[in-house]
Amino acid sequence: MLNILEINDFAAPELDIYARRTEAQLINKDNPEAGLFIAESPKVIGRALYAGYIPVSALVEKHQMKENEETRQILERFEGIDVPIFTAEFEVLTKLTGFKLTRGMLCALKRQPLMDYQNMCEGKDRIVILENVMNPTNVGAIFRSAAALNMDAVFLTPGCSDPLYRRASRVSMGTVFQIPWTFIQDNNEMRCQREILWPRQAITELRE
């Protein structure tokens, strides 16, 4: 049975994730194990769930919950796991979040620990490096292209936008959950390790 809760109090603390906390705050750098992110649209949420990310709660437009088959299929995956599903009309959700929801659905999920880039290199031949790509839309578009080109992994320098930011994951159409990725300290670190890690492999650098 689904745990559906109609929104009747904008000040409810459980809605802070969607209404009052920034994405940077959700990362929770002081306690990464408690970090969260927001996925938008049934397609993106479905790919996050398939990749093993654990849902914390969902925010769904009433009409979409009744009429959208893709939304209903995602909600079926919440059966029996007691994930709160907050629901309201479109106008209420727009007022709460400050933007129009794509396909009327958001989901808060737990972040997974990032892999060490050296371990991630093993067995991978085609690796994309993003250097200081700060726009989440561009990060998402690059991930989508990387998926289309069958790239094996994506590495990002600290100046890049987080691939799990809502806009990045939405523009990527959920491919951020399909391609292994991690952050590296800087490109110099990668270059100095290149001969050790990939003596016969090419690195592609993409810049804004």
Can you say where each PLM-predicted feature lies in the sequence?
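Boundary-proximal intrinsically disordered activation/regulatory segments immediately upstream
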Residues: 1-73, 160-161
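RNA substrate-binding interface of SAM-dependent RNA methyltransferases
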Residues: 50, 77-80, 86-87, 91, ...
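Short connector loops at helix/strand junctions that flank enzyme active sites
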Residues: 53, 100-102, 123
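A generic structural signal for short beta-strands and their flanking turns/coil linkers
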Residues: 54, 103, 175-177
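Phosphate/diphosphate ligand-binding glycine-rich loop within oxidoreductases
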Residues: 67-101
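Glycine-rich phosphate-binding loops that contact phosphosugars or nucleotide phosphates
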Residues: 107
